[in-house]
């Protein structure tokens, strides 16, 4: 698979910052080896890394060391706290709760809710939540109702091919609808991933913000100078001064 050129989480986050987004806490849920484009953009924030893979521990600890006051939670994010059976894939990054066990090996891992983590560690919003949990997004979000109420932006990876493996993977429309019911609407596309087979889009990283966000307060498409320049270009196309 390949990423669409010109799109990235960092570029999207920098646009959010330029537009005035303010944050106190950043949840990186599904860390793997880290999400470098997520770190260092917003000053003074706490990073909360949530990842069940034991193989990710050293990467998480290095990130926390670079960002004092941040947390490494060696557990999965779900709808309730406890333990769960996790399938570890050979490439590690594809590990998931919904992966067919024949494609990996089972491992019991601790599970937390983001609401529970926020309460236990006295975290505060505004939050940014990044989710990359291999189709388990809705389950992770179900345990984050309180956090979502203080979320200024959410980035979630989602498949456009539906549940192609029939294992319960979060799908595009249900995710958008679920978030919209909670007041979060689509704001930006941070990444588009195309499959090798035919370059069709397989998944995207979507950026959501509250419908009431100040980022959406201005409904104009252009400023006065941009409007005047656009009008002049269009008139010029018709041969008018």
Give a label for each model feature:
Residues 1-241:
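Phosphate/nucleotide-binding beta-alpha loop and adjacent structural elements of enzyme active sites
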